[in-house]
Amino acid sequence: MANETGYHGHKLLEEHILKNPLLSGQVIIEVGSVREHMDGQNSTGFFMELCKKHNMKLISVDMDPECSANVHKEAEKLDFKNYEAITMKGEDYLKTIEKFDYLYLDGFDYYHNMHSQKRKDKYKEILETEITNENSWKSHLDMVKEVYKKGNDYSLLCIDDVFDANKGKGCTAIPFLMNNRWKALEHKYNAVIFSLTA
């Protein structure tokens, strides 16, 4: 689906979160914290503003300590206190939770030829691996395998950078979710959002 708005999946998740009238005390978990400040791509700051408005908490998870430091800077800029910045692989963090309200997966990058050398070097340095589609698919599949039984009646799970069945981050995670009681609600802004079926 073409994305002519400049929005990403965090906007899609917000649109569906706001359908729930009882948001106070609920938690958004994002995997993939803010890196470069590019138009439409600062999901961390976007979620902080949403959480601040509705008395929610943000947990932002990233493998890169530099990205976690960016979370603290963003919180300071927005005067936002109700958050955690966790430096950990998304798969490892999601093993530790028992339930989730709202989950945003924008982790391991898929392959394209615009990645900076710095970003490629980070993957080699921290994860001892490279940016490939197969690695991205495996990471997102591993994450959904950790959480697919941890949703509740109103839980939402959003995967960003989903272009089609063969391109983007969700190529193996999405079929797994759909075979395990999760229903795709909408594909918009190059993202797909899911809820649990009864």
Language model features: what each stretch is:
Residues M1-A198:
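A short alpha-helical cap/connector motif
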